Amino acid sequence: MDFKGDFAMRGGRCFPLTVSDNYSRKLLCCHGLANTAYAGVWPQFERLFAENGMPWSILSDNGTPFATRSLGGLSRLSKQFIDLGIRVERTNPGHPEQNGRHERMHRSLKAWLAGVDSVREELSTLRMRLDAFMKEYNEERMHEGLGGAVPSALYRPSPRAYTGRIVPYEYDSQAIIRSVRQSGEIKWRGRMVHASALLAGERIALLPYGDGVWEVRYRFHPLGFLNDRTGRIEPLTQWREIARPETPRCKQRV
C-alpha cells in the first residue's frame, strides 16, 4: 500500500491511495483522496477487508498515515491493523525497491495520468480516471511476470473474514503485563516509563531478553527494549524483521 504522491486538482490536491495484492499483483484500491488523514483512509481499508477478506500482513513505506516516529513506528492506522491481527511490515527508508512490484504499478499509473490536466478536474472526475486505470491494469493488461496472465485471473480473496471485532490478545505466560496509562506511561520497577500515548488503555507485554533488558511488545508487534538501568524503552532499529504474529504463514499480503 502507498500513496502515488499527490497532484493539484480544482479546489485542492488529489492523493491516490493504492493497495495491491503481492502474489497476483491485482490492484485492489486506486482511490483519490483529498488528504492522507486517517479519517479518509481507514474507510477504504474497511471496504477492502469487507470485500476481499483480511490479509496476514501489509507492507508500506514509512510515510503518513502508515507509520510515525513513535515507538514501534505505530500510527493510528497501523495500530488498527495490528488490533485486527494483521502484521505491519515497512520498507527501509530510501529503499522503494523493497516494494518493487507496487512501485512498477505506480510507474504505469503515472504514465496513464501523464496527459491529464488535473488542475481543471474535480476529485470525482479524477476518481473515475483512477477506476478506469484499475480496470485496465487488472483485467486487460497482460503481465510478463505473471506469464502473460492478467492479475484478476490469479487473485484469490483471503479466507479471513472481516467482522470489525477486535479479539482480546493472550500474551505468553512468561510475559509481564503492564497497562498503559492515559499519559502513555507504564509503571515499572517503581518508576514511570514512557511507552506511547497511542496505546493508552491497552496492555503491553515485557519479555525477558537478558542482563536487565526486556523486549516490549504490543500484541505480536515489537515496540523496543526496556533497559532497567536507564529506565527507558529504546526503539528497535530493524523491528520489522522480527515482527511475527502467532498465525499461520500465508501468501496473502497486500
Where are these regions (language model features)?
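C-terminal, beta-rich DNA-binding module of retroviral/retroelements integrases
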Residues: 134-254
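RNase H-like DDE/DDD metal-dependent nuclease/strand-transfer catalytic core used by mobile genetic elements
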Residues: 3-18, 22-131, 136, 230
